C-alpha cells in the first residue's frame, strides 16, 4: 500500500508540472492566434475630449527622485485625450516631493499629494479620494507607459461591462546585466504566456501592480486597497473577483519598468511576492 502511494505521488509530482506547462503553452497560443490578432486600433485619440471617459492615473512614489524627471514627460505625452496625473509622495526621504510639486506647477493635469510614509496601498487610497476620473489607473513611479497604453485599457473595459479591471503588459527597461536580461525573457515570454492562457478562462488571477486600470466605482465598492497586505495588487485582484467582477489582460498596453539587477534585490522581490500570495490565501 505504501509503495503504491509513493508511486502515485511520484507520478503526480512529475506529471502535474508537465501537464500544466503543456496547458499554458497551448492555451496561450490559442489566445494569440485566435483572439489577440482581432484586437483593434486605439479608439479614443480622435474623439472630442468631452466624449471620452476621464482617467485618473495614480502614481505612488517613495524615494523616486532619480526616476521621476524621466518618467513624467512620457506620461504627459500619452495620446489618450482626457486624463489627470495624481502623484502621491509617500513620505519620501529624497527630493521626490520637490519634483512632483515642480511638475504640478508646470502642468495643470498634475496633482501632487503628500503624506507620511504609510505604504503603497495607503498612497493609492489617498489618490482614490481625490480622483476625478471614471477610471483609475495605477503605475509605479519608475514606470514608462507606452503612449497608447491607457487608450487600449479603457477600450477593453468600455467594451466589456462584466470586467472590473484590466492589467497591462509590463516589460523590463534595464537590461545592462545578465540578471536583467534574464528577467526580460521571463516577462516577455513566461508571464505573458500565463496571462494569455488565463484569459481563455474568462478572467486572469491577478493584476500587475505596475500597470493596471480599474473602474472607480468598483474600487469604491470593495473599499479600495487593503493596507495590511504586503502585496496590494494580489489582494485587490481577489477582492474584485469575489465581488463578482472579472479581470482582463491587455497585451497591447505596454509599460516599461525597472527590475532588480542584483541577486539580493531579486530575492527580496520574489520573497515579497510569495509572502503576499500566502497572506491573500490565508485571508
Tell me the role of every PLM-derived stretch.
Residues 1-49:
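N-terminal membrane-anchoring/stem segments of glycan-assembly enzymes
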Residues 53-56, 84, 220, 235:
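Cell-envelope/extracellular polymer assembly enzymes that use nucleotide-activated donors
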Residues 61-69, 89, 93, 97:
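A structural helix-start
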Residues 73-82:
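Short, acidic, metal-binding catalytic loop of nucleotide-sugar glycosyltransferases
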Residues 83-86, 97-130, 168-169, 197:
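Conserved donor nucleotide-binding strand/loop of the catalytic core
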Residues 116, 121-123, 147-230, 267, ...:
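Long helical/loop segments within the catalytic core of UDP-sugar-dependent glycosyltransferases
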Residues 136:
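Short aromatic/hydrophobic "clamp" motif used to bind/position activated sugar donors
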Residues 228, 237-255:
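Catalytic donor-sugar/metal-binding loop of nucleotide-sugar-dependent glycosyltransferases
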Amino acid at each position: 500500500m505504501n509503495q503504491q502511494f509513493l508511486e502515485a505521488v511520484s507520478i503526480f509530482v512529475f506529471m502535474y508540472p508537465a501537464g500544466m506547462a503543456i496547458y499554458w503553452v497551448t492555451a496561450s497560443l490559442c489566445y494569440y492566434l485566435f483572439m489577440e490578432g482581432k484586437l483593434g486600433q486605439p479608439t479614443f485619440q480622435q474623439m472630442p475630449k468631452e466624449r471620452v471617459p476621464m482617467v485618473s492615473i495614480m502614481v505612488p512614489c517613495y524615494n523616486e527622485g532619480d526616476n521621476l524627471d524621466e518618467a513624467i514627460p512620457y506620461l504627459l505625452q500619452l495620446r489618450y485625450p482626457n486624463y489627470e496625473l495624481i502623484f502621491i509622495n509617500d513620505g519620501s526621504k529624497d527630493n521626490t516631493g520637490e519634483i512632483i510639486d515642480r511638475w504640478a506647477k508646470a502642468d495643470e493635469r498634475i496633482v501632487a499629494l503628500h503624506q507620511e510614509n504609510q505604504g503603497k496601498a495607503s498612497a493609492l487610497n489617498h489618490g482614490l479620494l481625490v480622483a476625478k476620473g471614471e477610471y483609475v489607473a495605477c503605475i509605479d513611479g519608475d514606470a514608462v507607459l507606452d503612449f497608447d497604453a491607457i487608450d487600449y485599457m479603457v477600450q477593453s473595459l468600455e467594451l466589456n461591462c462584466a470586467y472590473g479591471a484590466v492589467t497591462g503588459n509590463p516589460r523590463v527597461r534595464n537590461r545592462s546585466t545578465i540578471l536583467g536580461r534574464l528577467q526580460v525573457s521571463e516577462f516577455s515570454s513566461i508571464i505573458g504566456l500565463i496571462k494569455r492562457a488565463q484569459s481563455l478562462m474568462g478572467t486572469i488571477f491577478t493584476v500587475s501592480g505596475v500597470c493596471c486600470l480599474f473602474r472607480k466605482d468598483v474600487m469604491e465598492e470593495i473599499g479600495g486597497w487593503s493596507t495590511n497586505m504586503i502585496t496590494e495588487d494580489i489582494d485587490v485582484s481577489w477582492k474584485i473577483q469575489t465581488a463578482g467582477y472579472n479581470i482582463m489582460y491587455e497585451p497591447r498596453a505596454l509599460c516599461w519598468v525597472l527590475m532588480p539587477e542584483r541577486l539580493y534585490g531579486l530575492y527580496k522581490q520574489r520573497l515579497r511576492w510569495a509572502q503576499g500570495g500566502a497572506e491573500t490565501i490565508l485571508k
